[in-house]
């Protein structure tokens, strides 16, 4: 394990029905004007919007709405939110939703405090990070991304045709109340849970390859995610399984699993590039790419793929490379078992030219066991059409 320094800023409120406790504790710290940020109409249809707004207003807060945050949030939406925050002198941002809402607000939080363009700042020659931000907190209604746990955000720049990470504010607190996920469509729940599994795999497959304490914690979380996805499919009202998946999502992205490692995340970077051109569902894209990408790195990644096969999928027979291959087969079978797609055509992506552009614009990650070329990434995308 490599050396590291660790300090973690996000306060966690976890548990069934913990929303009121969390907000009552945090509202006195929010200032007078709170921007309530959310996605579409489901928050209002479920009654959660009125519930949260009434609590804020009862505490004397002026509430400013920022709505319509889409899946795969755009940079234009970030600018819209920053404008609303500036014009209304917002003191605090309360993001209510899943990863897209929370990611968007992390960047709104810093863009609202500077006249400089955040994208140009972080991807320009100087590669500077903004330091001033509007404080924010998150109420999670769709787990899987772990977005509430860190300051990274994935934003689509439609003008540049890029879907890339930006870095903004940390949440001062996160509310993980499994009751708030009950109205979410099962397809979305499973997609989010697979994203959690992907985060774990992408961290596990990083460097150094030898297994350490954080890898062993990771193996336990992966087993837990697999078990609880199956439990939730068998019984969608299984609140225990929902809570377990919510906490697994948090654990996958609160940096614990990444201590002492350089993470892989080549699959994520490739999916982000495809998403910039197709606006595909993130979890679905990951499910399509993972098995084929791993087969392309069976030689270079055999040690960790074999360890994952044995310690996560229970495969004990065969040579290291044979176990690695069987583990990838087990992953692919699980993807089919839980109803996730395994081909781009299943989600309406059929344009090979777009996949070529996506491959060519993909960030090549230093933590991956294999140093892929853009041409080989394109071959992976073609094999999964």
Q: What do these predicted ranges mean?
A:
Residues 1-92:
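ATP/NTP phosphate-donor binding region
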Residues 19-22, 45-48, 75-78, 100-105, ...:
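Short glycine/serine/threonine-rich phosphate/pyrophosphate-binding segments
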Residues 51-52, 82, 101-115, 149-152:
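Short Gly/Thr/Asp-enriched flexible loops that form oxyanion-binding sites at enzyme active sites
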Residues 90-106, 141-147, 277-280:
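Glycine/serine-rich anion-binding loops at beta->alpha junctions
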Residues 113-213, 307:
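A glycine/threonine-rich phosphate-anchoring loop and its flanking beta-alpha core
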Residues 203, 207-330:
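Active-site segments that bind and position negatively charged phosphate/pyrophosphate groups
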Residues 305, 312-385:
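C-terminal charged capping/lid subdomain of soluble metabolic enzymes
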């Amino acid at each position: 394990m490599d050396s590291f320094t660790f300090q973690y800023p996000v306060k966690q409120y976890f548990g069934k029905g913990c929303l009121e406790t969390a907000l009552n504790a945090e509202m006195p710290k929010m200032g007078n004007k709170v921007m309530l940020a959310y996605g579409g109409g489901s928050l209002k249809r479920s009654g959660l919007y009125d519930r949260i707004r009434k609590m804020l207003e009862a505490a004397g807060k002026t509430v400013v709405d920022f709505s319509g945050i889409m899946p795969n949030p755009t940079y234009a939406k970030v600018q819209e939110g920053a404008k609303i925050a500036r014009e209304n002198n917002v003191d605090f941002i309360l993001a209510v939703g899943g990863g897209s809402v929370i990611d968007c607000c992390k960047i709104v939080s810093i863009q609202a405090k500077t006249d400089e363009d955040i994208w140009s700042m972080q991807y320009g020659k100087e590669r500077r990070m903004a330091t001033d931000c509007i404080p924010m907190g998150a109420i999670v209604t769709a787990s899987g991304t772990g977005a509430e746990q860190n300051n990274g955000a994935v934003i689509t720049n439609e003008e540049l045709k890029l879907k890339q990470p930006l870095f903004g504010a940390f949440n001062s607190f996160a509310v993980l109340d499994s009751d708030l996920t009950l109205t979410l469509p099962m397809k979305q729940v499973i997609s989010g849970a697979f994203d959690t599994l992907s985060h774990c795999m992408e961290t596990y497959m990083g460097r150094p390859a030898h297994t350490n304490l954080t890898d062993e914690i990771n193996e336990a979380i992966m087993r837990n995610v697999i078990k609880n996805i199956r439990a939730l499919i068998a019984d969608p009202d299984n609140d225990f399984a929902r809570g377990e998946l919510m906490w697994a999502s948090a654990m996958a992205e609160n940096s614990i699993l990444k201590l002492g490692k350089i993470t892989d995340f080549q699959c994520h970077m490739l999916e982000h590039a495809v998403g910039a051109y197709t606006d595909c569902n993130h979890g679905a894209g990951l499910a399509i790419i993972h098995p084929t990408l791993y087969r392309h790195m069976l030689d270079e990644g055999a040690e960790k793929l074999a360890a994952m096969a044995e310690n996560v999928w229970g495969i004990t027979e065969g040579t290291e490379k044979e176990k690695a291959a069987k583990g990838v087969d087990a992953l692919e079978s699980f993807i089919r078992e839980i109803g996730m797609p395994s081909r781009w055509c299943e989600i309406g992506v059929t344009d090979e030219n777009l996949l070529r552009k996506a491959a060519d614009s993909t960030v090549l990650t230093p933590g991956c066991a294999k140093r892929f070329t853009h041409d080989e990434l394109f071959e992976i995308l073609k094999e999964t059409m």
